[in-house]
Structures are given as structure tokens and as C-alpha cells.
Amino acid sequence: MRTLHMPKVDSMALMADGPEEYRRLARELIREGVDIIKLVISGDSFVPHAGSETTIMSEAEVAAAAEVAHAHGKRLSAHARSAESVKLCVRHGIKVIYHANYADEEALDLLEANKDWLFISPNIGFTAIAAYEGDDWFTEEQVQAMGFREGLDS
């Protein structure tokens, strides 16, 4: 699938807009046999219109996907870098959170209070490779602009 936000990248991602579309796609994925649905709740440093500290899904969209997944006994995981995206994950029972690197004090408190059922994967492997061995994917200017090395230091 060619995504509009990353025109030079083929992806298996599905794009949705609005709670009803998230519900529909979640049901479709479950009918196709998936066990885990991954949501991309925050942006990322390489997405031009939505940086890592941006929350790109609304609460209603996350709630809609979570409602369907939980009703069918499926799990959710999430790309969640921004503080608000981490909070949305906890509020809606998303058990696996990737990154969480911009979590504020409130988000950290929520993670601590719910640590018995949450799994946080900082996913620093990609960041380390991009920062120091990513010549095939990124220019030095992109590495600096995306803050990969700073991310490893924080």
C-alpha cells in the first residue's frame, strides 16, 4: 500500500479517519484473523506533518478501535511517542506501548500505576541503528534533524 503521508514507502498500514472508520477496519482485521492490532497514535520525527510529540488519533478514534478489539478478545499495541498518546493507551487498555519517549509526569504516573498489565518497549534498536549505522536510509542532516542521537541520550 502506498501511503499519502510517506509517498516513497510501501507499507502494510491501513489509513482511517474518524471513529466509525476505525471500528470498521478493526472488525475487518479481526475477520481476517489478526491477533493484535497496532495503532499509530502519535506522529514520528520522519513524518513531515506530524512530529513525535504530536498526537494524531483522537480519543474517540482510539476508543472505537479498543472497543472492537476488546469485545473480540484481541489485543492492541501502539506507536505512542507523545505524552497524550501514552495516556490514551493506558485509558483504553492498550497493553503494549512502543516508545513513550515524550511521556510527561502524568503519563509516567499512569504507567507506574498500571505496570502490572502494561509492557513498554522503547524500541531503541532502530534509533541506535539510525543514529550510527543508518547511511542506507538517512543522510547525516536527517539524523540530526530527527534527533536520533539526542533520543538515545535522554
Language-model region placement:
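Histidine/acidic-residue-rich, glycine-tolerant segments that coordinate divalent metal ions
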Residues: 1-88
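Active-site-adjacent C-terminal substructures of enzyme catalytic domains
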Residues: 4, 102-154
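Glycine-rich tight-turn/loop motif centered on a GG-T
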Residues: 8-16, 48-59, 94-96, 134-153
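Conserved beta-strand positions in the central sheet of alpha/beta enzyme cores
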Residues: 38, 96-98, 121
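Short glycine/serine/threonine/alanine-rich loop segments
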Residues: 72-75, 94, 116-118
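Structural recognition of alpha->loop->beta junctions
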Residues: 87-107
